[in-house]
Amino acid sequence: MNILIDTNIVIEHFQKGLLSDTDPEFHLYLSVISETELLRFAGMAQIEETFINDFLSITRILSIDSSVARRAASIGRTRSNKLPDLFIAATAIEWNMPLFTRNVKDFKSIPNLNLLESLPE
């Protein structure tokens, strides 16, 4: 099963090892938006940046293409979500993946978006 993971899931993984025992049948993906969010923290120690880069090097990262951009624009016409969330949601929809997030409230009103608050067992 392919699953797009939100930035907050990666942060929770860094803090608590959330993804350490993930079933190998789950293929985890990250939006390029989440990559940006992870790398933008000001004052990040070199060790933290190295840890993030190591994680990113083994993670499948999905770029924004025209179909994702158009889907994000379409969603954004009728909703007040922040642009990064629109791109993450649009990526999940266009790639036909559920979005694993702790910020369900930010995404729950988006049609055709399958949300996961935890990984299936």
Predicted regions and their residues:
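Short, well-structured N-terminal submotif of metal-dependent ribonuclease cores
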Residues: M1-L30, R40-N53, E121
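Acidic, PIN/NYN-like endoribonuclease modules and their adjacent C-terminal/linker elements
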Residues: M1-N2, A89, I93-E121
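Short loop->beta-strand "edge-of-pocket" segments that line small-molecule binding or catalytic clefts
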Residues: I3, H27-Y29, S57-I58, L62, ...
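Alpha-helix/helix-capping structural signal
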Residues: N8-I9, I33-T36, S67, K105
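Nucleotide phosphate-binding site architecture
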Residues: V10-I11, L39, K108, L116
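Active-site neighborhoods of divalent-metal-dependent phosphate/nucleic-acid chemistry enzymes
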Residues: F14, R60-R102
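Amphipathic alpha-helical segments within well-ordered protein domains
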Residues: T36-L39, N53-L56, A73
